[in-house]
Structures are given as C-alpha cells and as structure tokens.
Amino acid sequence: NDTLTVQVQNNKTWRDYIGVHFGTPKITVYLPEREYAMLTVHENTGNVEIPKDFAFTGADISVTTGNVRFFADVQDAKIKTSTGDIQVEDLSTGSLDLSVTTGKIMVSGVTCQGDVALSVSTGKTALTDITCRNLRSNGTTGTISLERVLADEAISVERSTGDVRFNGCDAAELSVKTGTGNVTGSLLTEKI
C-alpha cells in the first residue's frame, strides 16, 4: 500500500544493560527525492531530521525526548516534542503547528498560506522572516523574539513569564499579553 514502516524492537534482557556500553542505535532512511503523501514519525528518544530535498502533503512528528529539524516543504505540519528543540527553516507550508513542553522553537524563512501556531511551556521562541495569515503563540515561561514576521490578519502572543520582542513585524491586528515580562520592539505600521 505504498507505506514504509520502520520499527526497532528491543529484545535485550536486564543483563544486557550491566556494564559499559558505547553508542546508540541510529536509523537512516534514504528515499528518492520527490513528493510524498503523509510523513508520520513517533519517536521516544532520539533526534529527527527531514532534509529539504523532500515535499509532503502532511507531516505528523512526535518525539518524547529529542530534537526535530524540519526543512522539507509540506502542506500541513504538526511537530511536537516533550523535551527537545524544534527547528524549521526555509520552507513553504499550508499550516504549521509546533509544540514543545521544555525546549526551544526556532523558525526562519517560512512562507505559510494559513496559520502558524506555537506552544512552549518552558523555553525560548525565535521567529525570523515568516509570512502567514495568522500567527498565534502561547507559553508559560520563556522569551519570544519576532523579527520580520508579517501576518495578513493577526499576531497573538501570550506569556505568563517572559519578554516579547518585535523587530520589523506587522499584522492587521496585534495582541500581546504577558504576566511578568517586557514588550519591546518595532512594527512596520502604527497601532492604536
């Protein structure tokens, strides 16, 4: 059914974990450069990197502990990690939904036809050179910096604790809420 499934099954007993061990398992999957339908990755511990040579109609990536680096064009992407960083660069997308419990979100060079949604419980968010319809970011603890972020409709940022920094950003509507933190920066047009 044109589906590639890769699984690692651990058949070790507790005795296999006694002693000094070097190295961790690593899986590299090579595919022809072309557009694929859905990319689904569910990983407990490990890093995931998707290079720019691919295109997908959808991507659903979930990692418990590890970093995700995503560079491929995708129609709709949902990337989540509990502990780790998410890096998205130089791609076109229909929608982008990124979520980190503890870690950083770094997005740069993204053209999004729809909405960008970002959620960070604890960690920094850095957004650079993004165009989209709407951008929504919420978080508990951590600084968010937006540089040259342009939204056709709205930019909404909420933080419990942390600074919000704008540099050369704009949207028809702008909403910023922070419990403890400073809001600084520059917008391209005046807001009331």
Write out the residue ranges for each language-model feature:
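Acidic (Asp/Glu) and glycine-rich low-complexity loops/linkers
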Residues: 1-63, 67-81, 85-100, 104-120, ...
